Amino acid sequence: MKFDMLWSKIHRATVTDANLNYVGSITIDEELMEAAELLVGQKVEILDVNNGERFSTYVIRGERGSREICLNGAAARKVAIGDKIIIVAYAQYDRSELSSYKPTVVLVDEKNDIVQIKHEV
C-alpha cells in the first residue's frame, strides 16, 4: 500500500506578484525551490492563509535570489499580493519507507528569505 505524505513545504511565503495573463503555475525563486526540493513542473497545493483558498498548480523556476512567489493564470484570481501562503508538495511512500520519513519544511520571513530548514512535520 502507498501512502500520500508531505514531501516538502514552504511555510508562510509572501505572494510578491499575481500575473493573470500568464499560462498558469506558480513561479518560485530557484533558491527556495532547491531548499524545498521542488522540481519544475511538479504539482503543488497552495494554501492561502489570508483567505482560506486551497488549490493546485505546478511549479516554474523563478530568478535565483529574487524571492519571487508569483501566482500565474487563473490562480492569480485566488490570491492577493502580500498574502501569506503555504506551498505544499506530496509524495507517495511505501510503509517500509516511513521508518526513515523526514519531510522538508522551509520557513521563510516576510521577505521570503529562508529563516530555517527543518526535516520534520
Swiss-Prot record:
EC number, as in UniProt: 4.1.1.11
Main location: cytoplasm
Pathway: Cofactor biosynthesis; (R)-pantothenate biosynthesis; beta-alanine from L-aspartate: step 1/1
Cofactor note: Binds 1 pyruvoyl group covalently per subunit.
PTM field: Is synthesized initially as an inactive proenzyme, which is activated by self-cleavage at a specific serine bond to produce a beta-subunit with a hydroxyl group at its C-terminus and an alpha-subunit with a pyruvoyl group at its N-terminus.
Keyword Cell inner membrane in record: no
Biological process (GO), any one: alanine biosynthetic process
Keyword Metal-binding: no
Modified residues (Pyruvic acid (Ser)): 25
UniProtKB keywords: Autocatalytic cleavage, Cytoplasm, Decarboxylase, Lyase, Pantothenate biosynthesis, Pyruvate, Schiff base, Zymogen
Gene Ontology CC annotations of this record: cytosol
Coiled coil: none
Ligand binding (substrate): 57, 73-75
Catalytic activity: L-aspartate + H(+) = beta-alanine + CO2
Active site: 25 (schiff-base intermediate with substrate), 58 (proton donor)
Annotated function: Catalyzes the pyruvoyl-dependent decarboxylation of aspartate to produce beta-alanine.
Family according to the record: Belongs to the PanD family.
Assembly description: Heterooctamer of four alpha and four beta subunits.
Name recorded for this polypeptide: Aspartate 1-decarboxylase
Species of the source: Wolinella succinogenes (strain ATCC 29543 / DSM 1740 / CCUG 13145 / JCM 31913 / LMG 7466 / NCTC 11488 / FDC 602W)
